[in-house]
A protein has these predicted regions:
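Flexible, glycine/charged-enriched surface loops at secondary-structure junctions
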Residues: 117-121, 251-256, 303, 335-342, ...
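Conserved short loop/turn motifs at secondary-structure junctions
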Residues: 122-130, 281-284, 307-314, 347-348, ...
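Long, contiguous, secondary-structure-rich segments that constitute the structural scaffold
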Residues: 489-535, 540, 599, 620-635, ...
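Extended redox/cofactor-interaction regions of prokaryotic respiratory oxidoreductases
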Residues: 134-200, 205-211, 235-239, 328-448, ...
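Short beta-alpha connecting loops at secondary-structure transitions
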Residues: 222-229, 460, 471-483
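Catalytic, metal-anchored helix/loop core of enzyme active sites in primary metabolism
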Residues: 451
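N-terminal export/assembly segments and adjacent metallocofactor-ligating motifs
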Residues: 1-248, 285, 642, 688-715
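N-terminal leader/propeptide and maturation segments of large enzyme subunits in energy/redox metabolism
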Residues: 84-96, 101, 243, 248-286, ...
Length: 715
């Protein structure tokens, strides 16, 4: 502890230069992968950015995104002042206004709408970043609106949903102790440096590695076995592996017999998924399926590393991942050291080995006291199982229909309309609202359709609480004051709460006081955290035993791990809601729509990570753009390109029955023949507008971004 304190002093003077090193974290990526930063500050300006060597997650390293932090902070595109729209929506015509005028205008409008239409008519949306989400949800519920929505309507939570349907509580891979790791459609070398280092260390100590991924990646290059599954067929692959494990009696009979529900029906169902059938459905050779199943089932302990969203970005996504997670229970690798070990979340879904009052902070009003959430009737399992938020993918449908009640206003924090399928349709729907506010760091295309735009500051200009899985915690301090007239998201939420007249003590107390309230059960205070600006290990981490289910059972209706979901049994006969992890091909595929596939023979797979981008957050930065100079570009297998007469960087048209875009061709062996991969979010070539708005998984509401049908042709 003393060594960390010595290393992480808030202001370490660099002798003779006038430079002070101030500690922070990079918040460009997701909450569990935020690397430590050393910010070199001179005369109130950040002049250099380095990785913080004492940070236990990143240990001094930064990826290309974090290295470009200065360009992000000092971008010429930063919003400088609150703005009020003066021209038509989408015109980008605004005039500067004061903060008081902006906040008063919002509060008056929201309260008018609340009085006329009810609080549920106002929507509260969060994109990136995520640190303020508990505060925005508390604001929404204190206002009386159930309609707190986030970008998690397309990212990660459907994966958690599949785990909760199976076990009641997710278990993450114990990378330090596992002897066999099955990575399912994740590529941590592009997305999660800490996990990538753990894989390298595991390989050094002899850990076996199986990787399921349609693409060739740095992770697949390290694998003992690479299973190049056809996009959207993950469930069939998992069921075929289960077939081998059961047929060869490699499953854990004690766990299955004493701690599971529905195994007999599940076992009978997987009989149909022989390795040969698996090869037919997935394109993975039968012998590789058998080899992988034997390796995963026979080496103990073994763990599965899931991805945040690729497997659930299919119209059959949750059922696919249920089939994958069943392998954990089938082999008895749930909640054991070296397996998929259960560590409860401490803050923002991140396990921090401390107890907090986050749930009490965000759930201020019972759902029963509010109107049904957006999408509740259409996606009831999303509502029942996650019990967290509304399903944002239903937003445009309810705006247009006005059913079961009208939606009149929306405030977005970092909202990007291009995250929706049929993105143009979403923007057109938002423009039908009576009032739209967006808070952002930059003037985005979404902001151009807002009535009021508010400037947010970056993470290095404010404080933030962050927990890490290894029991590390940090409460950052501003390295520099907020630039221009920008403010923190939390400050904006507090100001709005006051002007809305909400009688909520914790929305009046101030950020640091609220963090103290949340952390109270841990015995850690903001004052203590400030002594360790680079972060600290929690002094009394929670001690977690293996197999906690032996005493507490499983948090499922049966109290057991469920091969056959009792939640889904309630929806018997509803397509896509089968209680067993039934495999069905994607809604648009050669199997489901053969006539459509004749005209649109390629699988369109979008959004898989590139190392220099995370969504669109670094598109405007010259350093990251220089690493992919030909973007927007579509990845095409060279064999397909040769057949179509397409050369590198030539213009190609990608079309679906919905729309078409023109991009450059990027020829690469990373993608399979018959598959086109396109990164998302480009204003000049928005691939998400090629998807129908209702191309969704019926269980989660997630879009099928990774397995639609398309045509590609040379322009």
């Amino acid at each position: 502890m003393k060594d960390v304190k010595k290393l992480s002093r808030e202001r370490m003077l660099v002798s003779g230069t006038g430079i002070e090193i101030r500690k922070s974290i990079c918040t460009i990526c997701d909450p569990q992968t935020q690397c430590g930063l050393d910010l070199h500050v001179k005369d109130g300006k950040i002049v250099k950015v380095e990785g913080s060597k004492e940070h236990p997650y990143s240990v001094g390293t930064l990826c290309s995104k974090g290295a470009a932090t200065r360009q992000y902070i000092y971008s010429e595109d930063r919003l400088k002042t609150p703005l009020k729209r003066t021209g038509p929506r989408g015109s980008g015509k605004f005039e500067p206004i004061s903060w008081d005028e902006a906040l008063d205008t919002i509060a008056v409008k929201f309260n008018e709408i609340k009085l006329q239409n009810g609080p549920e008519s106002v929507i509260f949306f969060s994109g990136y970043t995520k640190y303020f989400r508990p505060y925005l949800k508390r604001l929404a519920h204190s206002f009386g609106s159930p309609n707190y929505l986030t970008e998690s309507s397309t990212c990660h939570r459907a994966t958690a949903m599949a785990q909760k349907l199976t076990f009641g509580q997710p278990g993450g891979p114990d990378l330090k102790n596992t002897r066999c790791l099955l990575v399912w459609s994740a590529n941590p070398f592009y997305t999660n440096p800490g996990n990538a280092r753990a894989i390298l260390k595991g390989r050094e100590r002899g850990m076996k590695l199986i990787v399921v991924d349609p693409r060739e990646t740095p992770t697949t290059a390290l694998a003992d076995i690479h299973l190049p599954v056809r996009p959207g067929t993950d469930g069939a692959l998992a069921l075929s592996m289960a077939n081998v494990i059961i047929h060869e009696k490699l499953y854990d009979r004690d766990f299955v017999g004493n701690h599971s529900y529905g195994f007999e029906d599940y076992s009978e169902y997987v009989q149909h998924f022989t390795p040969e059938k698996g090869e037919e459905l997935t394109g993975v050779p039968a012998d590789k399926i058998t080899q992988a199943a034997r390796m995963y089932a026979s080496i103990k302990p073994a763990a599965i590393m899931p991805s945040a969203s690729p497997v659930v970005h299919h119209t059959n996504g949750v059922q696919n991942y249920r089939a994958v997670f069943d392998l954990i229970g089938l082999t008895g690798n749930y909640d054991i050291i070296g397996g998929n070990f259960v560590v409860p979340a401490s803050f923002l879904h991140a396990p921090g080995l401390i107890l907090t009052r986050e749930h009490e902070f965000i759930q201020t009003r019972p759902w029963s006291e509010m109107a049904p959430r957006v999408g509740a009737d259409r996606f009831p399992v999303w509502v029942d199982v996650l019990d967290e938020e509304a399903q944002a993918m239903h937003l445009p449908f309810q705006i247009r229909s006005g059913e079961p009640y009208p939606l009149k206003a929306l405030i977005g924090f970092g909202m990007n309309y291009r995250m929706w399928p049929d993105s143009k349709g979403l923007l057109e729907s938002v423009e039908k609202l009576d009032f739209f506010v967006n808070v952002d760091i930059f003037m985005t295309d979404t902001c151009k359709s807002a009535d009021i735009v508010l400037p947010a500051c970056t993470s290095v200009e404010r404080s933030e609480l962050r927990c890490y899985p290894m029991g590390y915690i940090i409460f950052t301090q501003p390295a520099i004051p907020p630039l221009y007239e920008s403010r923190s998201d939390v400050e904006i939420i507090y100001e709005l709460a006051g002007r809305l007249g909400l009688d909520d003590p914790l929305l009046k107390a101030g950020y640091e006081a609220s963090v103290d309230w949340i952390l109270a059960p841990s015995g850690i205070s903001v004052a203590e955290l400030k002594k360790y600006p680079g972060g600290m290990f929690v002094p009394n981490p929670i001690k977690l035993p293996e197999k906690k289910y032996l005493k507490a059972g499983f948090k499922t209706p049966s109290g057991r791990m469920e091969f056959k979901s009792k939640v889904l049994e309630r929806y018997a006969g509803r397509p896509g809601f089968e209680a067993l992890p039934v495999y069905t091909p994607p809604k648009h595929s050669k199997e489901s729509t053969p006539e459509l596939a004749q005209d649109y023979p390629f699988i369109l797979n979008t959004g898989s990570r590139l190392p220099m981008f995370v969504h669109t957050r670094t598109y405007r930065l010259s350093w990251t753009n220089s690493l992919r100079p030909n973007h927007p570009a579509a990845d095409i297998n060279p064999a397909d390109a040769a057949r179509l007469g397409i050369q590198q960087d030539e213009a190609v048209r990608i079309s679906t029955p919905k729309d078409a875009i023109v991009v450059k061709a990027n020829l690469t062996q990373m993608v399979q023949p018959g598959v086109v991969h396109m990164y998302h979010g480009h204003s000049e070539a928005d691939v998400n507008m090629l998807f129908e708005g209702d191309y969704l998984d019926p269980l989660s509401g997630y879009p099928g971004f990774k397995s639609a049908l398309c045509r590609i042709e040379k322009v």
